[in-house]
């Protein structure tokens, strides 16, 4: 769907900005690039009626939607570098073990996997979706801070995002406007 493409592009842009701000190396930026670009490729098999539902998903629809990460892993496994596969496959994992699909914990997740998890959330909050408008900056910052304080996502990464929030958004908007012209 067009929404998924826009979300993918913003997740990629946010993840790369965060990676640069955290001084990850060139090879790690490449892994971030491909992992974030491919993180939702499994959504190609999710029905549009679920992807673009103008309401909260039912439990069954959410179960189907969550399958996209497993499908992503299956599509990429064996054809992409294992680190890229893991970045894409693990973007819904949470540091305290409540994420999916594996319920991994902090010690199981690399810095790059954590960066894309934050980039994905930032994109979801910043972007307009079929079921919601984009959130204002202060609400986005509050949600990210709460998730970090509750041990779901990396406090270190969120601190970088909060400190450089306006720059991250500004760079994304400039890039998006150039792409849309």
Question: Where do the PLM segments sit?
Answer:
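Histidine- and acidic-residue-rich, metal-dependent catalytic cores
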Residues: 1-181
């Amino acid at each position: 769907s067009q929404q998924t493409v826009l979300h993918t592009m913003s997740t990629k842009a946010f993840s790369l900005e965060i990676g640069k701000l955290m001084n990850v190396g060139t090879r790690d930026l490449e892994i971030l690039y491909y992992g974030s670009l491919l993180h939702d490729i499994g959504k190609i098999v999710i029905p549009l009626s679920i992807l673009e539902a103008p309401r909260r998903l039912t439990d069954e629809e959410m179960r189907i939607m969550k399958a996209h990460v497993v499908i992503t892993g299956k599509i990429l496994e064996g054809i992409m570098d294992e680190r890229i596969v893991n970045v894409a496959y693990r973007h819904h994992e949470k540091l305290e073990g409540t994420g999916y699909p594996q319920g991994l914990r902090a010690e199981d997740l690399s810095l790059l996997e954590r960066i894309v998890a934050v980039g994905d959330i930032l994109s979801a909050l910043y972007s307009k979706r079929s079921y919601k408008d984009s959130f204002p900056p202060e609400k986005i910052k509050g949600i990210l801070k709460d998730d970090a304080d509750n041990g779901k996502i990396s406090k270190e990464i969120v601190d970088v995002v909060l400190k450089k929030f306006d720059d991250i958004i500004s760079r994304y908007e400039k890039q998006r406007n150039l792409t849309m012209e």
